[in-house]
Design a protein with these regions (language model features):
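Domain-scale recognition of functional cores that engage charged ligands
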Residues: 1-197
Length: 197
């Protein structure tokens, strides 16, 4: 693998992504948001380029907050969903949060708590948003943990615990990943307990 700046990627005459020295890029892991890439002239070359993105294009659907009101419309009242609607720009009611469609790690989030108090985070995201019923995180000594889970098919594969000192989990949150494996490895050391990370 080789690291390359986005500005150093070009498109060849036959529509393939290349480095500055015209080496064809066959596989790419990128940190650039898919929604930004797809909105640019550069991104229009993706479908015919033969480039394999290690973050697949379908992930843009799941990372778009617009999926939340659509899920609510189709599965209203489901115990694993919070009520969500596309934002009309009206005042945010108590007990609700506003989230830009394309945002990450708690940026640009106003949270109107059920008790009437507010908490907000700043960030670079603008544009359309959704509103969602807020589910307040439990505080442990002023810290707010959030568990994210990964399920492939019907198998649990991992969890990530993010903890922030704010009710809005931001990019400064502490993070501990955990893998869920089918076979348990031997303990790290005798008497140290059986903790696997």
């Amino acid at each position: 693998g080789q690291a390359i700046a986005l500005e150093e990627i070009g498109i060849s005459a036959d529509g393939r992504f290349t480095t500055l020295d015209d080496t064809v890029i066959g596989t790419l892991f990128k940190l650039y948001p898919l929604e930004d890439l797809m909105a640019e002239e550069f991104g229009k070359a993706l479908p015919a380029s033969g480039l394999q993105l290690l973050e697949p294009a379908w992930k843009a659907v799941l990372s778009n907050k617009g999926i939340l009101p659509l899920l609510w419309q189709r599965h209203q009242g489901h115990p694993n969903l919070l009520e969500a609607h596309f934002d009309t720009g009206a005042a945010l009611p108590a007990g609700w949060v506003r989230k830009p469609l394309f945002s990450r790690e708690g940026a640009n989030i106003p949270l109107h708590l059920a008790d009437g108090s507010w908490q907000e985070s700043e960030g670079p995201y603008t544009g359309p948003s959704i509103i969602q019923a807020a589910h307040p995180l439990t505080s442990f000594d002023g810290n707010y943990p959030l568990v994210g889970s990964w399920v492939v098919g019907d198998h649990a594969c991992g969890i990530g615990i993010r903890e922030d000192d704010s009710r809005i989990t931001k990019d400064s949150a502490r993070f501990v990943p955990h893998a869920i494996i089918d076979e348990v490895p031997p303990p790290i050391a005798a008497g140290s307990g059986k903790i696997y990370v």
